[in-house]
């Protein structure tokens, strides 16, 4: 289960990593979004991006995600999806359909 504390830290951390305004939304999907998670469930997060992230930002994201895994004894599975790909494939590819259908928006750019 994604607790309020985890959610707040997740949003704060991702906003710090993506301070370049490249992030459009943070979406929770999977068993946590469906309220079907167990103690062993990972926390599936999709980050909707305006453009590809550069290698330095990706490295920061990987390190930060690993820290979150250790801090909460949970696996944070974080993927990035370019907004243009979500627009193009959102109604065709099962994975994108799943994120759109069951996803819970945790944060969205104003």
State each model region's role.
Residues 1-25, 33-39, 50-110:
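Catalytic core of pol beta-like nucleotidyltransferases
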Residues 44-48:
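Short beta-strand->loop micro-motif that forms the acidic, two-metal-ion catalytic signature
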């Amino acid at each position: 289960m994604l607790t309020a504390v985890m959610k707040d830290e997740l949003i704060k951390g991702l906003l710090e990593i993506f301070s370049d305004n490249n992030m459009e939304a943070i979406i929770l999907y999977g068993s946590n979004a469906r309220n079907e998670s167990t103690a062993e469930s990972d926390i599936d997060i999709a980050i909707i991006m305006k453009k590809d992230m550069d290698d330095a930002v990706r490295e920061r994201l990987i390190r930060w995600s690993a820290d979150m895994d250790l801090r909460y004894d949970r696996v944070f599975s974080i993927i990035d999806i370019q907004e243009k790909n979500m627009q193009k494939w959102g109604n065709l590819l099962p994975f994108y359909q799943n994120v759109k259908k069951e996803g819970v928006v945790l944060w969205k750019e104003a």
